[in-house]
Amino acid sequence: MEFSMNATVEQLAPVEQQATTDWVVAALYQFKEVADAADLQQRLLDLVKTINLCGTLIVASEGINGTVAGDRHAIDTIREFLLNEGFHAMEYKESHSAEKPFRKMKIKLKQEIVTLGVEVKPRDLVGHYLDPKEWNELISRDDVILVDTRNDYEYKAGTFKGAIDPKTETFREFPDYVKQNLEQHKDKKIAMFCTGGIRCEKSTSLLLQEGFNEVYHLKGGILKYLEETPAEESLWEGECFVFDGRTAVTHGVEEGQNVKCHACGWPLTPEEVALPSYEHGVSCVYCIEKTTEKQKEGFRMRQSQIAAAKRKRL
């Protein structure tokens, strides 16, 4: 039986800290046995009440995962706390944002730190890790099947040249995709990638568990690739969707040009924003025909409330 216990703490940092203009964004995860996940959740809650931090951390018996943002002191504090808790092998990446990327700080207690819905053992069985140079060499080969393990809206913002889109809406759908589309390719080289690497820890573990022979994944995910790979050597096309206020990033992990439709969540290019179907917070080319006028009116009301709240803070 799946459970999900969420705890949310509002920002309690001093006003002068809230004026941060250089938000350090830290994406992190590690698969590690956690003896008492509920206790770790509570101690994290106690800590984040004392520092200027926003974002989400997911805690489970299998480890920790999340993205948080704050000033330098806050990020260093949370990282030191996790290191002291034994998370010495975290996959950890930093980038920057000029604006606050998340509204709140959430610490969630869940059954999985990334939900696949199928039991796998990524601490014991995972695919071969490849650095960016090795990755470029592998996916340039004709005998490799390249699979994007992310969701459809993420694929839309950008992907690697030649990558297959599984057309999943959630990661839970990925095991079914494997059964229906990859089972006949167990003797092939399979290369997989995701945003920060965590979904590939589970997807490669799944394939190996199912009897696939050669399974590879990009160490550190797309974010690490964009951070380390010069644009002129890159096989990445488009931008990388991220789950914060930046919407998407590009090479150097710099903020991209895509913006998010706040009605449906899909990333939009500047050209799509210029279409008549786009109304900020209300509709875009991908959802305008999928919502009723009553729903659109509700979205407009929500946007008015958001705008009023922003004016009040100024």
UniProtKB/Swiss-Prot annotation:
Oxidoreductase listed as a keyword: yes
Under SUPFAM superfamilies, the record lists: Rhodanese/Cell cycle control phosphatase
Q: What EC number(s) does its UniProt record assign?
A: 1.14.-.-
Provide the alphabetized UniProt keywords.
Oxidoreductase, tRNA processing
**SMART domains in the record:** RHOD
> This protein is called what?
tRNA uridine(34) hydroxylase
Q: Which PANTHER family match?
A: RHODANESE-LIKE DOMAIN-CONTAINING PROTEIN 7-RELATED (PTHR43268:SF3), THIOSULFATE SULFURTRANSFERASE/RHODANESE-LIKE DOMAIN-CONTAINING PROTEIN 2 (PTHR43268)
- GO terms for biological process, alphabetical: tRNA modification
**Listed InterPro entries:** Rhodanese-like_dom (IPR001763), Rhodanese-like_dom_sf (IPR036873), TrhO (IPR020936), TRHO_N (IPR040503)
Where does the record place the Rhodanese domain? 140-234
Q: Name one GO molecular function term.
A: oxidoreductase activity, acting on paired donors, with incorporation or reduction of molecular oxygen
**Name of the gene:** trhO
Summarizing the function annotation, the protein's role is: Catalyzes oxygen-dependent 5-hydroxyuridine (ho5U) modification at position 34 in tRNAs.
| Ranges annotated as spanning the membrane | none
Active-site positions, per UniProt? Answer: C194 (cysteine persulfide intermediate)
Catalytic activity, as annotated: uridine(34) in tRNA + AH2 + O2 = 5-hydroxyuridine(34) in tRNA + A + H2O
Q: Which organism is it from?
A: Acinetobacter baylyi (strain ATCC 33305 / BD413 / ADP1)
The entry sums up its family as follows: Belongs to the TrhO family.
Q: HAMAP family, from UniProt?
A: TrhO
Q: What class of enzyme is it?
A: oxidoreductase
